[in-house]
Design a protein with these regions (language model features):
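Short amphipathic alpha-helix that is part of the acyltransferase structural core
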Residues: 1-55
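Conserved active-site tyrosine of GNAT-family acetyltransferases
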Residues: 20, 112, 117
C-alpha cells in the first residue's frame, strides 16, 4: 500500500531532495538542476511504502504546473506515479484551479495520457531530451 503526504518544502526537502538527486542526477545523469528556488513555493507530494520508506515524489507550482516526478525504480508501474498525481490534482481542485499542466519526456507521455492529460503544442527538445507539454482540465 502506498501513502501520499502533501508537504511544504521545509517538510519535504529532507526526503524529496535525496530521492530526486538519486533519480535525476545519478540514474538519469541530468545536469543537476533538479532542485531550484521554486521548491519553497511548491506543494510537494511524497509517497511512502508500508515501512515508511520514501518511494516517490512530485511537486506542484502555485500556477498548477506539476513537475519533478520521481519514483524509485522498483516501484515504477505499481501505481505510485498515479497516486502522486491524484494527490496533487485533488489539491489543485481544492484550490479552485481550472487545470494542471506539465512537461514530460516524450517516452513518458503515454502514462500521462492515461491519467487524462492532453498534449499541447509540438514536441520540443530540452537538455537533449524530447519533451511534450500536456494539460488536464479539472
Amino acid at each position: 500500500m502506498v501513502r501520499v503526504a502533501l508537504l511544504n518544502w521545509e517538510e519535504a526537502e529532507p526526503v524529496a531532495a535525496p530521492l530526486r538527486f538519486a533519480i535525476f542526477v545519478k540514474a538519469q545523469q541530468t545536469d543537476g538542476i533538479e532542485l531550484d528556488e521554486r521548491d519553497k513555493d511548491c506543494l510537494h507530494a511524497v509517497a511512502y511504502d508500508d515501512a515508511g520508506k520514501v518511494i516517490g515524489t512530485a511537486r506542484m507550482l502555485p500556477d498548477g504546473q506539476i513537475g519533478r516526478m520521481a519514483v524509485v525504480e522498483e516501484w515504477r508501474r505499481r501505481g505510485v506515479g498515479a497516486a502522486l498525481l491524484e494527490a496533487l490534482i485533488a489539491a489543485a481542485r481544492e484550490r479552485g484551479y481550472k487545470d494542471v499542466s506539465l512537461t514530460v519526456p516524450l517516452q513518458a507521455a503515454e502514462f500521462y495520457r492515461n491519467q487524462g492529460f492532453v498534449a499541447e503544442g509540438k514536441v520540443h527538445q530540452a537538455g537533449g531530451v524530447l519533451q511534450q507539454a500536456m494539460r488536464k482540465a479539472l
